[in-house]
Amino acid sequence: MATAFDSPTASPAASPFDDDSFLRFDAAAPAPAPADAFPPSPEPYAFRPDAPSPFGMPEANGSLHDDPFAAPDNDNGPVLPPPNQMGADEGFLLREWRRQNAILLEEKEKKEKEMRNQIILDAKEFKKAFVEKRKLNVETSKDQNREREKLYLANQEKFHAGADKQYWKAISELIPHEIANIEKRGAKKDKDKEKKPGIVVIQGPKPGKPTDMSRMRQILLKLKHTPPPHMKPPPPPAAATGKDGAAGKDGAKVAAAASKDASANGSVPEMEKAAAAAAPAAAATEPIAAA
């Protein structure tokens, strides 16, 4: 049975393949130029003439545009700096932290300045109060020293007034009457703290060793036997030679009393002086008694 597929002319698809005008295009044949096309350029590829082209566009990096992002004419390097000089892109949290930190530092600096100014004011007030207190203490000390000096001079006058009469009593008055309290090392008890004597003697490096008083005894003995001139008693008055023997007896009694005082004081030269003064008085009484 015959079908449409059996006949070569039954369908348009069965027409010859070369009948299409598009398929019959020959690449070697020159292409027809349209009437409105530009003439071909005689310049080869990558050739730029000295004269500018009337149809060309100006360069982006030229002076015809005021582009702030354009590179300068004489710059041949990269537009961006090197990567090691470019900072890392900071995030929002880091920028916010830097802002808060700057605010905190500013507040802290402000507080420090206020505190410093307050300290300076307090120091000025303290110095002013210290100077005033110092002046008051100096004036008080001057008054106290004047009173103490007056008392000391009065005591010295009193001491020298009676020192020539009983100088051993004067020496005993020079020694303080307070009993020295020996303070031991270590912890103090409450009872010891309550007692506050006038003189406190702290034990030396050798506890239990008695104080050497030999030098003090030597000085006292030297003062006893050879007293200084201001502590020597005045010489007794000379016995008045009278016609009656009463004056002679009185002179002998005065000489005997002086010798007794001298012996009581313990001064050997004074005893000799008293004996020498009593001898003429006794010699003067003997002729009167014989007569």
From Swiss-Prot:
A GO BP annotation: intracellular protein transport
Biased composition (Pro residues): 31-43, 228-238
Region of interest (Disordered), ranges: 1-91, 183-291
Pfam families recorded: Clathrin_lg_ch
Alphabetically ordered keywords of this record: Coated pit, Coiled coil, Cytoplasmic vesicle, Membrane
Coiled coil: 93-120
Family designation: Belongs to the clathrin light chain family.
Name assigned to this protein: Clathrin light chain 2
Organism for this UniProt entry: Oryza sativa subsp. japonica
